[in-house]
Amino acid sequence: MQVGLAAIFFGFLATNVVFADDSEGWQFVQENGRTYYKKGDIKETDWRVIDGKTYYFDYNGEMVVGWQYIPMPVKGYTIGPYPNGIRLEGSPMPKWYYFDENGVLQEFVGWEELELKDSLTVGKKHGEGWEGPEVLKLAYYYFDQDHSLKTGWLYDQSNWYYLAKKGDSGNKNLGGERRVGWINDGSAWYYLDSETGIMQTGWKQLGNKWYYLRSSGAMATGWYQDGSTWYYLDNKNGDMKTGWQYLGNNWYYLRSSGAMATGWYQDGSTWYYLDNKNGDMKTGWQYLGNKWYYLRSSGAMTTGWYQDGSTWYYLNASNGDMKTGWFQVNGNWYYAYSSGALAVNTTVDGYYVNYNGEWIQ
């Protein structure tokens, strides 16, 4: 069969134009601004291969162009409109295909940059007049071996990509386009390179914030251990936290690198102790390195005189460790028991200390 196309374009066409004829009497005909493939009054519908090119004619026999959501023919099945809009068991599922301005199925396989699939470019018929946008929006799409459009996750040449699905969060288009930036596939957040669309993993700085993307690409939240170092990533937004953070009824300090601090930490002129394993800020009496320290409710290490109930203690002015035995402060001698409690109104080693604990010579 040889069927030639003449003067076909995506726009208005003259009516009742016979484009070509063949020995069986089939011909392309333009009627009422639409294009049909007819033999007498019989209009072809569904898929048709004409002169080696594939076309699709809808249930009215109108030839389609642009983006179309239609079933691909499967051997042994008759393709047509679903009764009452219901797909019969065993009939092929519809897929997305792209037809050029002449109605020819584009037998794409792999990546193609095409007009954006949206309400302006979907479901058009050959000869249908419409005014597209002044600036054509383009997007990258991926086509399978049967020339149908793929959606969802795609693994191609050692990289992962995400091809939008209709109804995806934050996506107003009809799906299939290669996404970039942040996307949520319904299970987790992912970041796709802003230019290539390749799924990112590992540490990633975006704007002024850091994020960690697991080997699966999923954005990490909450506590995350990298080697021997712990980090905290916002439980909702995933951005890495720094500075003081109150988490689960405990305070933590995260350095400018995001690494959780442990052990002694100096903030300005104040010292704090952060659990050597868990990193939570300690308060109250703490026995560290064979010495006692007192950390206030704020976590700040106490120095100098400290009263606990009716008992006084003296904590070294320079390093905060609790004094025991005889010690001197501002020219006065004092005695603290092994518990650290200051001796008052008593005699120690033959020396009398008054109600302030001062040795009276």
Where does each model-flagged region fall?
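Extracellular adhesion/carbohydrate-binding repeat motifs centered on closely spaced tryptophans
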Residues: 1-361
